[in-house]
């Protein structure tokens, strides 16, 4: 949000005459009380002659690819300057800002007289962006009539000695998206009296003699308040004054017409969005309801938008008048000939506004405020302020009628529920002995009503602070306003014996091992892409299709929480490949969400007491399983090309090796068995077992899945359930034999469908305790071996703990291993 320093200072000074601080000090104060200042933008600076001019004549120059105009500009005392300009948004008689030769504009751009398009250009007519007044550079800055006389100092008229603060307002502090809210914060920070610009003393109530317009509201829409007031007989030719246009411009809003400008101005001033309808274009009764299936509406930007049944609308008897809290509709738009206006101020459901504006891709200043909640107590005050301002600017008469729907039954007290808190709670939490009365004083400053009952405070938060719900929220306010810098920095003692759990240690070890093996870790999104399981071809009853839906998702097309990590990894793989990174190895360690038959939604439990054991048991039973998974994907070359050769493409064996890396890091033994499990290739997929428990799958992905998902050919993947892998106890240090090892190789021919792991297990069982290690280093197939046969060559390492082995000892163990393999898997020693 952007706000000018001069406007903030003016509102704060109403309650503290003479108050004045520098913009730099104000920036530090805002940061100190918890508001992030993204940027401080000084207007200008300009150096040299910048003046106000009136366009006396315009000559259109032809023969060029774009519009070019030679303008005669009166800069005072009938001094005319010819200036060449490419903008077309001004006419003869308009007041403009002219930078004369010798002037230096923001960015160090110096103006000089020059020849352009065959004419002499003696200066430049400036846009708002060129003067650092805003980002709009689509046309030059046109001042409203009466803003100044030709020859007046441009810097003074524009107020270029001002500063604009660009703040990032957090979602829980919607009240600060206004001058009213930020001025109150500054008054608290400086211990000043604050005069609320929405109070009766500043906005005297207008008379009410009857309802302004017939209205019906569907209670289920979540609307809390809906107010209407007409302004009759405004001048369609009226223009907003420069002081108002300037403030809108500095806040990033373009001025259009008085009816729209005053609603935007009051929104910035008081924080309450409003909308202006053309009263003469409304047909019959206004109503608030949900959109119907298939219904559409043409919004103010001229686009017809398809609505959802969750969208809340303002409608009349003929058409949609607005999408509630998001944008008005074209049917009741205020136009150039509008004379009667119906002003509307409503309080919409924040979740509904957020959902609608995201789905329609219609972010707006009003929606940003409604998402963060708006003060319902000032709806009529904001409406009266807007109506009075519009009548002052554009003439007309404020109708003495008002429609103010406040729910059924009507609500008269908009304050959140009161909170009880011990007076010393902030002191105990902060470890600071605040002066007596500090807590009550600070809470009163933020607008709360505070009453004492011995050592207990009863605090009723103000209507604009729905975020204050429990004592901890009140403590935060006291600590923030007193200054976080006074809280002592004390490092909490770490109790002996505490540290990472076995599961945390294992996850770190696995991540480190995969990273050292060439994998790059990503943080996966917890949501499933739409239709991913259809791309994989999963059966309708596949357990991975049983997902948990989020009611208010970050993305409308991704409401389901992930039951597997692979979709997120495969999306990251596709993005990397599309950007030229074709040799990719990624992994992720994260939770997945797997609902059960008992998973269900439960109501909120009150936070003012400890939950009962039954309530805790109910909550635990309602939660879905959330096991930790580890997953990896590989594509491209696993071994890079170079002088040694063309490189080795990724294959299923690399996925199996990733399983072994994870197993070694987990200190468990795994067994790989052939399996058929989508999205893996049925002939190149292994099911991973620890003991007799299945913990996941690995291998090459199915060619059809690869093609439909746009993945590189031969993509491989692994996914294991870490929670299904037991955390082993710390391994004792092994006894290291001081005797040398004996190395021998053995080649065994087996049927092509026999897993290499089964052969290795048979060899290990036959060789006995002398076999220290076995490693497969060659697989050979060909006519020499026979059809449907393969040759597996293993490197064997023998060692005894108590003596030096002879070749005969090793050969005997090797022969026993061959015999065992022959008996178990039908292996034949290759000659």
Curated annotation (Swiss-Prot):
One cellular component term from this protein's GO annotations in UniProt: phenylalanine-tRNA ligase complex
InterPro entries linked to this entry: aa-tRNA-synth_II/BPL/LPL, B3/B4_tRNA-bd, DNA-bd_dom_put_sf, Fdx_antiC-bd, Fdx_antiC-bd_sf, NA-bd_OB-fold, Phe-tRNA-ligase_IIc_bsu, Phe-tRNA-ligase_IIc_bsu_bact
Required co-factors: Mg(2+)
Limits of the B5 domain: 414-489
A biological process from GO: phenylalanyl-tRNA aminoacylation
Family recorded in the similarity comment: Belongs to the phenylalanyl-tRNA synthetase beta subunit family. Type 1 subfamily.
Free-text remark on how the cofactor is bound: Binds 2 magnesium ions per tetramer.
Superkingdom of the organism of origin: Bacteria
EC number: 6.1.1.20
Substrates-to-products reaction catalysed: tRNA(Phe) + L-phenylalanine + ATP = L-phenylalanyl-tRNA(Phe) + AMP + diphosphate + H(+)
Residue span(s) of domain FDX-ACB: 737-830
Protein name according to UniProt: Phenylalanine--tRNA ligase beta subunit
CDD domains found in the cross-reference section: PheRS_beta_core (cd00769), tRNA_bind_bactPheRS (cd02796)
Alphabetical keyword list: Aminoacyl-tRNA synthetase, ATP-binding, Cytoplasm, Ligase, Magnesium, Metal-binding, Nucleotide-binding, Protein biosynthesis, RNA-binding, tRNA-binding
Main location: cytoplasm
Occurrences of domain tRNA-binding (ranges): 44-155
Chain residues that bind Mg(2+): 467, 473, 476-477
Subcellular location: Cytoplasm
Quaternary assembly: Tetramer of two alpha and two beta subunits.
GO function terms (MF aspect): ATP binding; magnesium ion binding; phenylalanine-tRNA ligase activity; tRNA binding
